[in-house]
Regions:
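ABC-type ATPase nucleotide-binding domains, specifically the catalytic core motifs of the NBD
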Residues: 1-11, 19-21, 133
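Conserved catalytic motifs of ABC-family nucleotide-binding domains
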Residues: 51
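Catalytic Walker B motif of ABC-type/P-loop ATPase nucleotide-binding domains
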Residues: 55-59
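Conserved ABC ATPase signature
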Residues: 30-34
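ABC ATPase C-loop
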Residues: 47-48
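Hydrophobic anchor residue at the start of the ABC signature
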Residues: 44
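Helical segment within the ABC ATPase nucleotide-binding domain
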Residues: 70-82
């Protein structure tokens, strides 16, 4: 990895298992045998192992079913509660804004709208153009 740990990482692993309990049950299973949502949890857990202050997520729900998407957003909320700042790019704007402290809507690569997640969800221009009404 990019950063090698010299401390006892067992405590960090325990924190990851508390965030993602299914991973404890699947710890002896190969990652390739896990579901898409479980693999995303492994990816989040790996990123959290270095105790980052900022976590960057690029389309974390891409290619997963709606049920798994809801589960992943629940996990992102759990990570947010650990005081890790999250910078996320996400096509599912409505759900992403619903959990965001701050949001930016880009149009052809330029920032068109910004505000709190709640402000953007309530902005009629954002709703009609990007959130389906």
């Amino acid at each position: 990895g990019a950063y090698l740990r010299n401390d006892n990482y067992q405590n960090v692993i325990e924190e990851i298992y508390e965030l993602f309990p299914i991973l404890r049950k699947k710890k002896y299973q190969l990652v390739g045998e896990l579901s898409g949502g479980q693999r995303q949890q492994v990816a989040l857990g790996r990123a959290l192992m270095i105790k980052p202050s900022v976590l960057m997520l690029d389309e974390p729900t891409a290619g997963v079913s709606p049920i798994v998407m809801d589960e992943l957003f629940d996990h992102i909320i759990k990570v947010k509660r650990t005081n890790v700042a999250i910078l996320m790019v996400e096509q599912n704007a409505k759900q992403a804004l619903s959990i965001s402290d701050r949001g930016y809507v880009l149009v052809t690569g330029e920032n068109r709208y910004s505000g709190t997640g709640k402000e953007l969800l309530n902005d009629s221009r954002v709703r009609s153009s990007f959130l389906g009404g």
